[in-house]
Amino acid sequence: MLKKIPNILTIGRIIIVPFFVLAFYLPGFYGDLTALILFVVASFTDFLDGMLARMMGEESKLGELLDPIADKIIVATALILLVMDGTIRNYEVIAAIIILTREILISGLREFLAKGKIKLPVSSLAKLKTVLQMVSIALLLSGDTGNKIINFQDYNAQTIGIILLWLSAALTLFTGYDYMRKGIDHAMSEAVSYTHLTLPTKRIV
C-alpha cells in the first residue's frame, strides 16, 4: 500500500482541479482562500510524490505518465482562470501563453521520444522554472488578502506574482529550447544509428 502512495498523490492532484475551479469562482475571502489552499496543496503533492517515489524506488510507469499530466493540468487551469478574470492582463498574457505553449510542445516531444525509448531528464533550471510558476500563481491567487499581507512600498503580492511569472516565462523559453535541441539531437542520432543498421553493405568484387 505504501508503494502506491506516490501514484495516489498524483491522481489526487488531478482530482483537486475541478474543486479548485469551483473555489476560484466562489465570491469573497473564503473563495479566494480555498482556491489558494487547493493550489498550494496540489503544488506540494507534486514535490512530495516525486520524492516518495525516489525514496521507495517505485517510479512506476503510471507515475511517469500521470505526473507531468497532473502538473500541466493544474498550472494551465490556474493560468487560464487568472487570464479570464483579469488578474493576468494586457502584455502579461504573453507570459501565460509562453508557459502554456512550451508545456504543450514539450509534452508532444516527450511522447515522440518515448516511442524510441528516449527519456529527457528534468534539468535543474526546469525545476526552478516549476517552482517560480507555482509561487507566482499562488501569489496571484491570493488576491486582495495577499496584497494586504505582502506589501513593500510599490510591491504587493500581485506585483511580485507578475514579476515571477515573467521570470518563469523567460526560463520556460530557455529550458524549452534546451529540451527541443536535445530531443532533436537524440532523434537524429537514433535515425543515423537505424540507417547504419538497415542499409546493406557494399560488396567489393
Where are the model-predicted features located?
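Short, hydrophobic transmembrane alpha-helix segments
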Residues: L22-Y30
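Conserved small/polar residues in nucleotide/adenosyl-binding loops
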Residues: T195-T201
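A feature for the membrane-embedded catalytic helix bundles of lipid/isoprenoid biosynthetic enzymes
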Residues: L2-L22, L36-V40, I69-Y194
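Short juxtamembrane and helix-loop transition motifs at transmembrane-helix boundaries
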Residues: M1, G57-L62, I88
